[in-house]
Design a protein with these regions (language model features):
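Cofactor-binding loop segments of dinucleotide-utilizing enzymes, especially the Rossmann-like FAD-
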Residues: 34, 57-60, 166
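FAD-site-proximal beta/loop scaffold in flavoenzymes
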Residues: 5-26, 103-110, 114-171
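Rossmann-like dinucleotide-binding cores of NAD(P)H-dependent redox enzymes
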Residues: 42-86, 195
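Rossmann-like NAD(P)H-binding beta-loop-alpha module
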Residues: 24-50
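A conserved FAD-binding loop/helix module that cradles the flavin
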Residues: 41, 164-195
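General small-molecule cofactor/ligand-binding pocket signal
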Residues: 11, 78-80, 94, 162
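A conserved short coil-to-beta-strand element within the FAD-binding core of flavoproteins
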Residues: 82-92, 97-99
Length: 195
């Protein structure tokens, strides 16, 4: 959690991508995280009128696919590397610089905290699948990556239980996740009609 997550100008990427037309972003947008969802938010924000969009990542590289990053750069998205979010404010996020030592360890550099002005800040930090349901529910199999095993309709190995999203496919684009989730919702509806 980052201090300031509940401010009115701070949003989660997944919420924005569901209905981008309902958001008034302003001209400057900051995005924390650099996965495929962050690229989706960045490109969508530019199309919806933002003039300057910057993606901030804690490492020296971006987690999104090469294709997604290239498209974002073509669209005019800016990238800031080795930044650690300290606090979110109504004037924009505050980041500290991260230095990487010779052993490859990342350390926040004290005294480098700086406000990066933005009208809107998005949190697009990827989150791995949550394993609580698998560890507390019998009959749901997972693969070697810890993802829930499902058929083409999202049915798990336990009767009557369906799954979709990152917990099934890993980190994909929001468009792919929504497409599969809609198919799973249809399969769930069909299943429930037979009960």
């Amino acid at each position: 959690n980052i201090k300031g997550e509940s401010l009115g100008n701070v949003h989660f990427a997944i919420d924005y991508l569901v209905n981008p037309d309902s958001y008034d972003l302003g001209e400057k947008v900051a995005i924390i995280g650099a996965g495929n969802s962050a690229m989706d938010v960045a490109r969508t924000a530019l199309r919806k009128g933002a003039r300057e969009v910057t993606v901030y990542t804690h490492s020296e590289k971006v987690r999104a696919s090469v294709r997604e990053v290239e498209y974002a750069q073509i669209d005019g998205v800016n990238f800031e590397y080795c930044k650690s979010p300290v606090e979110l404010t109504d004037k924009g996020p505050i980041f500290a610089d991260i230095i990487i030592n010779e052993d490859g360890e990342k350390m926040v550099q004290a005294g480098t905290e700086k406000l990066y002005p933005a009208d809107t800040t998005f949190i697009a930090v990827s989150q791995g699948p949550k394993d609580k349901i698998v560890s507390t529910t019998q009959g749901i199999d997972v693969n070697q990556r810890g993802l829930i095993t499902v058929d083409e309709n999202g049915k798990t190995t336990r009767s009557g239980i369906f799954a979709a999203g990152d917990v099934v496919n890993g980190a994909k684009t929001v468009v792919e996740a929504v497409k599969f989730s809609k198919a799973v919702a249809d399969a769930m509806d069909e299943y429930m009609q037979t009960l």
